């Protein structure tokens, strides 16, 4: 058994390394200057008429979204000017993407804070958890 231990240990390490890589790609729980909200808290903001910005890829947006969400793909469309056309810096705004494994909404929230937006909400759980909760989608 001891002769096979190094090979077994190496196999286990190699087998678990993809899991470590996935864990490292988790979105942050908070964004400085923004408020992290749960799907339940986001629903209250939705019901209050707050602007939701979907920063996912166009194909994700086309496949399903929160009703009325504005699509500003973070890779091509999210600029200070484009966001300013959708929401004023003093007004609340919610950013979302594809949940914990997606960095787009945390990056967008940080960008908005940097541009002077004072009421930024970060829906870390994103569209998947919103949909799973049975909240409105289109």
Model-derived segments and spans:
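Solvent-exposed coil/turn segments that connect beta secondary-structure elements
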Residues: 58, 75, 98-100, 135
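Catalytic cysteine-centered active loop of the rhodanese-like fold, especially the PTP/DSP P-loop
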Residues: 84-130
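N-terminal, post-signal-peptide region of Sec/Tat-exported proteins
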Residues: 47-83
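Active-site-adjacent betaalpha module
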Residues: 138
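Sec-exported extracytoplasmic/periplasmic mature domains
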Residues: 47, 51, 66, 88, ...
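Flexible, polar/low-complexity N-terminal or interdomain linker segments that lie immediately upstream
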Residues: 2-52, 58-60
């Amino acid at each position: 058994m001891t002769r096979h231990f190094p090979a077994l240990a190496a196999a286990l390490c190699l087998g678990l390394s993809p899991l470590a890589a996935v864990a490292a790609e988790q979105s942050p729980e908070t964004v400085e200057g923004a408020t992290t909200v749960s799907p339940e808290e986001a629903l209250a903001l939705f019901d209050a008429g707050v602007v939701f910005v979907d920063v996912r890829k166009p194909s994700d947006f086309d496949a399903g979204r929160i009703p009325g969400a504005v699509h500003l793909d973070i890779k091509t469309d999210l600029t200070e000017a484009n966001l300013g056309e959708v929401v004023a810096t003093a007004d609340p705004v919610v950013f979302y993407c594809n949940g914990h494994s997606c960095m787009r909404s945390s990056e967008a929230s940080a960008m908005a804070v940097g541009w002077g937006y004072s009421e930024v909400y970060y829906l870390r759980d994103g569209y998947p958890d919103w949909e799973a909760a049975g909240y409105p989608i289109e």
